[in-house]
C-alpha cells in the first residue's frame, strides 16, 4: 500500500491567522503536511522527516527583542525553506540581513514586480504577459537588507524586498501571502516549492487516505467492537462510513434523538446509515428527557451544559449494553489537534481547548479511534463524497452541537423546537430552490421568545417572531451577513407565516461578526 506520509512538509507556525490555510493549500496540491508551533522541541525536526519547511506569517515584529525565531535546526537541516511574511522577515534577520518597521502598514492588494526569475518565479506573468503578480499583503515590518548569499527576486513601489532567495541553499522568502486566493498565482508558487523544489510526490488524495485509514483502524482495533456517537453532522457521518467500510459489523453507532435536531433529521440519519448502508445504529428517542431537563432554564451556557451532560449520560447508558466494545470512535479533526497543542511559550496562537477529548466519563475506559485527526474539514468532506455519502449531507451548513437548544432564545420548549425546525426547513428549502444554498456559508432560523401583533384574515393575531440568519465567511472567525435578494426573503417570510400556525412576523439579521457572533446564543 502507498505510504502517503513519506513525502511531507513541516510548517512552523508563528501565530498567523492564515497558517491553517497554508496547510490546506499544500494538502490540496496532494502533499501531507503538519503544523507545529515555532517553539516546538527543535530536536524533533530531524526525526519528522520533512522534505521542506515553511515558516508562516505572524503578528510579532522582528525589530523587537524577544521576537519569535526559527530554530537553528531549520537552517542546519539542509532542507528547502520557504518564509512567508513574518517567516521571510525572521529568515532575513536570523541569517544576517535586516528588517525595519514600515511607516505605514500594508494591508490588501498589491502588485509585485519580478526582477529575478528563480525557481519560484520563473515564467510567471500577469494577464498582459508582464513579469508582475497580483498579491495580498498584510504586514507592518519589511526586509530592508537581504542576508549574504540572497538575491532580491521581487519588489513593489512601497517595499524594496517583496521576495528573495538563496538558490544554492534552496531558501526562499516572500513578503506577501501565496496561500490566500487574492494572490492569483499563489497556488502555483506553493506547488513549485513543494513539488519542484522539495521533490514531494502528490500522494495525499481522498482515495489513498481512505485506504490508509482502513489499514490503520484494522491494525488498531483488531477484532474488538467499536462504538460511535452518531450525530448526523459531517464529521461523525464520515467516521461512521469509514469505520463501517473498515470493520463492518464490529461498529455500533449510538444516535441520540434529542428533539433539538433539524426537521426530520432523525429519520434521515436512520434511512441513510441503518437502511441504505447497513450500519448498526441504536436510536435513542430522548426528547422527553431533554425537554424535562431544560424546563425553566434560560441561560445559554446552562443550556449547553445540560444538553452536553445529558448526551454523555445517555451515551454511557447505551455503551453499558455493549459489553464487547473496547474502543470509542470520535470525529476529532486536525484543527482540534492544533488548537489543543498550542505553544509552550504562549506566544503562538491558541484558539480553544479541544472539545471532544474529556467529554465522556473516565470510567468508560475505552481506547480512542480518531480516523479524521489528520484532516481539515474540507478534506473530511472530500472523503465523505469518496465514501459514497450524499453531497447534500456532506456539504451541509454547520449545525451547533446543542442543536436548536441554542437557536431558541431563552427557555426551550417542545412547541418552540417544532416550530423552529419547520421554519428552518422552509428557509433551507427555498435557498436550495433558488440555487443560493451553496453560495453562502451558513443559514438558519432563530426562535425569538417574544410575541408580535399581526393580522390573520380579519382577526388580530399575537404570535411568535422568527429571525433568519445567513452569513458569508472563509474561516468563521469573521463573517459578513449575506445580501440575499429582497424577493427571495419575501418568499421565505410568506411561506413561514402562511404555513406555520403561531408565527406572525419574520425578521432578517444583518449583523456582521464582529461585533455579533454567528449563532445568537
UniProtKB/Swiss-Prot annotation:
GO function terms (MF aspect): ATP binding; GMP synthase activity
Gene Ontology terms: cellular component: cytosol
The protein's assembly and partners: Homodimer.
Listed name of the protein: GMP synthase [glutamine-hydrolyzing]
HAMAP family, sorted: GMP_synthase
Domain GMPS ATP-PPase: start-end pairs: 204-396
Enzyme active site: 85, 177, 179
EC number: 6.3.5.2
Pfam family, one: GATase
Residues bound to ATP: 231-237
Keywords associated with the record: ATP-binding, Glutamine amidotransferase, GMP biosynthesis, Ligase, Nucleotide-binding, Purine biosynthesis
Pathway(s): Purine metabolism; GMP biosynthesis; GMP from XMP (L-Gln route): step 1/1
Domain Glutamine amidotransferase type-1: 8-203
SUPFAM superfamilies registered for this protein in UniProt: Adenine nucleotide alpha hydrolases-like, Class I glutamine amidotransferase-like, GMP synthetase C-terminal dimerisation domain
PROSITE patterns xref list: GATASE_TYPE_1, GMPS_ATP_PPASE
Domain of life: Bacteria
Job description of the protein: Catalyzes the synthesis of GMP from XMP.
PANTHER family for this protein: GMP SYNTHASE [GLUTAMINE-HYDROLYZING], GMP SYNTHASE-RELATED
Catalytic reaction(s) noted: XMP + L-glutamine + ATP + H2O = GMP + L-glutamate + AMP + diphosphate + 2 H(+)
